[in-house]
Amino acid sequence: MLRKHIKIESARWYYHCDRLGMLVWQDAVSGGGTDGEYNAWTTNRKPTLIRSTWNKFRDDTAKHFTALGADDPIYRRDWSRTCDAMVHMLGGHPSIVTWTLFNEGWGQFDACDAAERIHALDPTRPIDATSGWYDQHCGDYHSVHNYFRPLEIYPDKGPLRGYVAEFEKKHRRRRRAAHYVVLPVARHGVRAFVISEFGGLAQLVPEHAAVSRAYGYGEYDSIDDWRAAVRSVLASAAALESRGLAGYVYTQVSDVEEELNGLLTYDRRVDKFAE
């Protein structure tokens, strides 16, 4: 599975995913901010340092619009139109199995309203309304990013909202009617818990990078040490499957312009993981 992160590719890319049977989580393009910048405390430092904020920070008031870089009404209108257009344009590709709406609070606003609207446009695919943090208790996933803490499954706190709340009611009625009990790992047992970003371990390959210094997580004396660290964090994620983890997305397939945490180099000429 690939998560196409905050960008849309050409039709050719999706054609090849369709042809190969690759599953794609498609992100909406992020926007908002002031001159392309977000409030570093709200969208990065606070959720990194204080995990308890993830389920408590709203996104549907003027105050929160400003904090999340979504205070411009023209931006909010344009983002909504663009997100709808993405679903219309790409909805015919069977490779796409999830729509991701907001990432790490960047320009996030009214995530539950957005999830309801996209669900009405395409009821066939699950929706990751808020990937990373600032969960609004809606959409089909409880979706977190975890780069700095031991990997674990967090309980789904708070009453669910929107179409998934209606699904939960029906689910409970069916369970009562069938006279059986399910003991879910998450509190509600309706939304899937996913770690939608983790890892991000950096390794520079000289002459195959767009930047000269590594941006990513961890420092390794050799590429063998880096490979061992990648295997370890992947094994930690896989071990959570038996406890209810529904999926995970390692960061990332390749180095990009300012990051050296890919499994492939920026020019795609070196597979760092190949021994």
Regions found by a protein language model. Give the residues of each.
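Active-site mouth of glycoside hydrolases
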Residues: 1-141, 145-148, 186-189, 271
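Short, well-ordered secondary-structure micro-motifs
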Residues: 37, 139-140, 154-155, 205-206
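Substrate-binding clefts and catalytic carboxylate motifs of secreted carbohydrate-active enzymes
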Residues: 80-81, 95-99, 155-275
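Short, solvent-exposed loop/turn segments at secondary-structure junctions
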Residues: 106, 134, 148-149, 199-202, ...
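A polyampholytic, Gly/Pro-enriched intrinsically disordered region
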Residues: 146-156
